[in-house]
Structure formats: C-alpha cells, structure tokens
C-alpha cells in the first residue's frame, strides 16, 4: 500500500468510528441530562440533585440549594457537560412593594450566567482544540517517528495556558471574553546520550472570545518564534533558520448533539522572517462522549485536526488523537486525558516547517 494513502485511510476509519458512535447512540435528552447533572452535583459538590432542572438542554439551578457551595466551579463544570446549551441560576425573588395600579408584575429574576463574569473569571468560552499540535496546554508525550533522518524516539512536552482576563455579558444571552495565551513546545531526542533538545517553539497571544449557546468564536493576535537545541546544533552543523512571525487568526466552533463539535477558521502571517507565504486554513471535529465508563470515572474522547498552509503548497497536515479523560483526576481544575496520537504532514516544529514527518505517540494532557 502506498505510504501516502495511509493518512487518508486513518482519517476515514476515524470518521467512521465517530459517525457510528453518533448514529448508534440516542441524543442526550432532558431526563438523561438531569440525572447526569444531578450526579455531578452530589458527587463533586455535595449538593442535592433536586437543585437542578432541565428544559431543552438548559440547566436551571436553584440558588437557595447552592448555599455554601462553590457556585463558580459548579457553573464551569455543568457548562462543560455534553448536551448542555446553557446554565442558569434562579435567584429567590426578593419581597417587593405592591406595584402601582395598572403596572405589570416584574418577571422572576434569573441569573443567565453561562459562566461567571468580571476580572480573572473561571472557565473559558472557547473550548480547547484537542488535536491541534500548537494549542497551549500542559502535556508530555512519547512519539515514534517513521523514516525521519534525525528523529526516532522522541519526548515531546508543552507548557502553556489560556487565561481569561475579563468576561462580560453581551446582548442575546451571549458572553464575551478577553485574555492571553502562552505556551512553549519542545521536543527531545531520547535516543541521544544527553537526551538532546531538538527544537523549541515559543508562543504568546492576546485573544478575544465570544459565545452564544452552542456557537463560539476565538480571535487571536500572536507571536511565535522557533529555536534549535544547542546540542543538536553543535552535533549536526545543520543550517539554522531564524523563524519568527506575528499572526492573526479566527476560529469558529459549533457544539453538535452526542458530544460532537465541529470547528474551522483561518490565519494570516505578517512581519515574518523568512518571507513566508501568509495564508493558512484549519478545520476539525471532536467527540467527547456523553456516556462514561467505570461508574462515571472514564470518558472516551477523540479529535481530528486538519491544517493547510500556503507556504507548504496547501499540503494537508493530519493530526489525530483519541483516548480517555479521567473524570476523577483534576489538577487546578483541569482534566487529565490519556491520548494516542498520530500525525502526518509538514512538521509543526518551527525550524523544520518544510519537512514532511509522520509519527505515532502516547501522551498525557491537561485540558480545561
């Protein structure tokens, strides 16, 4: 079988798996969501399941039953449940003086807060792209490269975060958010005696996000630069590329039934060195199972990310990741995911952006 056909077969098999899973499973209905959300409230927050009701995917919480609980964390956790379109908190109506004759009664007050607002709020309006090789987050992975002249056994780590600085409410029960992203992505040659650093990319961004119901968008202005490891540079005498650029990009995302999400977008480089062609496009699909295993402790997840750049002749870079999310393992309110990963395309490691690579790996990822 030609090697070029392998990524297409892998993508086709992955899409077939997601389609079959979606077709075989009924959409999460309101009774299912009520039971699921109630179990989360009781298990993680010691709040009675009677505090939640569901209508067409909208969760309504009784504020009186949330007394003493971490309301912000409850909103963040329940908003992330598959099938949930919005979370509201119904406050108890305060006694009021009788209205003047002929005046209509005020409607019941309700806090339509999908997520908390203000400075340094918890949660995120735009969810992470699980298979994007350059999404800032904390991770560590082993990768095996096929047929690469320099890489075979590789350790890959990333250190990064998305930090919302301010979030506010917007018309139509939508919300907006502004913040920063930053990350470092490094790969090491594990088969070298000193485990040489091969390449490190540095990323920093200002971002704005907006969400209404199942639709969300993310726009970024960012800088990225790339650097070779000293040991590799001295040993190989390779010609170093001074790769650095600024970029703007925009991503659109929509949450579908059965835990499926689709997204797409594009980007444009400027102030780039060397003189790279500027345009790029990106799209993908994710599956976060609404159904869990092992008494709610394990959630299957899978993701496909496709990217194409003008600089590389619009060749498609294929990134596939799939595995499990451990629901009972959280660090700083982040979920731990154990994922098998496959990549075929132009290298995401900046110094080697012209090189076609293929690898298979296994990693641990912390995502919000």
Across the structure, where does each feature detected by a protein language model lie?
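Residues on the lipid-exposed face of transmembrane beta-strands in outer-membrane beta-barrel proteins
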Residues: 159-165, 206-212, 250-254, 283-289, ...
